[in-house]
Amino acid sequence: MATLEQEIKRNIARGDKKVNGFTGAVRSLENLGLEKGDEFTIPERFDVYEQKIGDNAVRYIMVELKNGNAKPFYPSTFTKSRPVYNQDGTPTGQRVFTKGTAAELFRQYGSVQEGMDALRGKTVKVSDIEQVDTLRYGTTSLMKAQIPTIDLV
């Protein structure tokens, strides 16, 4: 892994850009990059970056993990939700969503910016990651989705 400064340089080199805050809809991402046990503090002052994914753009902040490594953190992680499917591709009727005290706090607010503002300076920890069978977007093929539990520390 890389330091915060190295990771920011890498992301900008691949085309990401710094933007003014969070706007638009929350988009769920499959590859969160989070692992069980990751712990980090949402900075009091953070820069927001925008990453193009196909025709869409997603916004994130960079966080430094307790172990010194850096990762992008997408606020959409707090609202991640997926329907659960059986191995034969039929729906179970269940839906799994991000759990935890940090996710609950974020979801109390009406916008991404307000939710992130409420988390400024707070330390969070990925206390669990649940693997669920779901369908790949726009297809009938099964995939494993990772749904985290993110708690305030």
Protein language model regions, located:
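Short beta-rich binding modules
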Residues: 1-153
